[in-house]
Amino acid sequence: MNQLQNLAEALSASSPVSGTVQTVVDGNTTTTTTTNTGLGVVAVGAGLAMIGAIGSGLGQGYAAGKTVEAVGRNPEMISKIRATFIIGAGIAETASIYSFIVALLLIFVGK
């Protein structure tokens, strides 16, 4: 039970903070509630967005290894192999670029 209480306290520390503002205009009272998502929640989201770069990195490493093997087997075809590898690496890199853009948007816009 103590672990659940610790987890609940940790989650409440990173939960959005809300505040209430009361405005009086011409005798009328208006209550407005504001919510501020903490920077901690945004940072966790940005970190999770960068998980998309893991698959891209693994795929590019595997492709580079296979490219070296192909050049080792047939050195005369290096120009065609290189061109194919560069195109494939560019396509594989798009996932990590999109993940990075999402992380930047969360950090700078998601406050």
From Swiss-Prot:
Sequence intervals crossing the membrane: 38-58, 89-109
Domain of life of the native organism: Bacteria
Subcellular location: Cell membrane
Bilayer topology annotation: Multi-pass membrane protein
Any single Gene Ontology cellular-component annotation: proton-transporting two-sector ATPase complex, proton-transporting domain
Annotated site residues (Reversibly protonated during proton transport) in this chain: 93
GO MF, one example: proton-transporting ATP synthase activity, rotational mechanism
Keywords noted in UniProt: ATP synthesis, Cell membrane, CF(0), Hydrogen ion transport, Ion transport, Lipid-binding, Membrane, Transmembrane, Transmembrane helix, Transport
Signal peptide: none
Family affiliation: Belongs to the ATPase C chain family.
Function: F(1)F(0) ATP synthase produces ATP from ADP in the presence of a proton or sodium gradient. F-type ATPases consist of two structural domains, F(1) containing the extramembraneous catalytic core and F(0) containing the membrane proton channel, linked together by a central stalk and a peripheral stalk. During catalysis, ATP synthesis in the catalytic domain of F(1) is coupled via a rotary mechanism of the central stalk subunits to proton translocation.
Subunit structure, interactors included: F-type ATPases have 2 components, F(1) - the catalytic core - and F(0) - the membrane proton channel. F(1) has five subunits: alpha(3), beta(3), gamma(1), delta(1), epsilon(1). F(0) has three main subunits: a(1), b(2) and c(10-14). The alpha and beta chains form an alternating ring which encloses part of the gamma chain. F(1) is attached to F(0) by a central stalk formed by the gamma and epsilon chains, while a peripheral stalk is formed by the delta and b chains.
Listed HAMAP family: ATP_synth_c_bact
UniProt name for this protein: ATP synthase subunit c
Protein source organism: Mycoplasmopsis synoviae (strain 53)
Gene: atpE
